[in-house]
UniProtKB/Swiss-Prot annotation:
It holds the Pfam family IspA. It is a multi-pass membrane protein. Signal peptide: none annotated. Plays a role in cell envelope biogenesis, maintenance of cell envelope integrity and membrane homeostasis. It is found in: Cell inner membrane. It comes from the Bacteria. Belongs to the YciB family. InterPro entries: YciB. NCBIfam families: ispZ, PRK00259.1-3. This is Inner membrane-spanning protein YciB.
Length: 181
């Protein structure tokens, strides 16, 4: 359910684009992202960092898109957000006792430190590549292809990557249990 909630602004953007075009879709995504943050706050009395970061950039770049009537601003939003995630993930190797992925999942999964480090770096690399891939699609294909890639392409890549991470975690969690006997 959280997955759908997280993807709701993208889904609304996609639907609005298909019916009314990039500018209405941009405005819709701006409104829905703000609603998403508000609903999350009302429900949990806290903010989800991912939602807030996305909201900031969709409001900023969405406003530029609407004011200047140029879709390039909204097309850059995913790349900027992905690269911020990559920088934060990579930077967590140098700040604090544990990497960001370790801090996020340590209550749920027990893994060796080396495995946590590799997971964190793989997520950082994944977001870096996803940002580059978004720019490749932006500058080499039309807006319709970019919108389809934004929903279906990134979703498929994310699911495949998460599945690969799950297998990697399962293998190393199994090794950890075997080695501790």
């Amino acid at each position: 359910m959280k997955f759908l909630f997280d993807y709701f602004p993208i889904i609304c953007f996609f639907v609005a684009y298909k019916f009314w075009g990039i500018y209405i879709a941009t405005a819709a995504a701006m409104v829905v992202s703000a609603l998403q943050v508000a609903i999350y706050w009302i429900r949990f009395r806290r903010f989800e960092k991912f939602h807030v970061i996305t909201l900031i950039f969709i409001l900023l770049l969405g406003s530029f898109t609407l004011v200047f009537h140029n879709a390039i601003f909204i097309k850059w939003k995913p790349t900027i957000v992905y690269w911020i995630f990559a920088i934060v993930l990579f930077g967590s190797h140098f700040f604090g006792k544990h990497t960001l992925v370790h801090r996020m999942l340590k209550e749920k999964i027990e893994l060796p430190a080396k495995t946590w480090s590799r997971l964190n770096l793989s997520w950082a690399l994944f977001f870096l590549i996803l940002g580059v891939l978004n720019l490749f699609v932006v500058y080499n294909f039309d807006t319709n292809t970019w919108v389809n890639f934004k929903l279906f392409g990134t979703l498929a890549l994310m699911l495949v990557f998460i599945l690969g991470q799950a297998f990697y975690i399962a293998r190393h969690a199994q090794n950890l249990k075997t080695n501790s006997r």
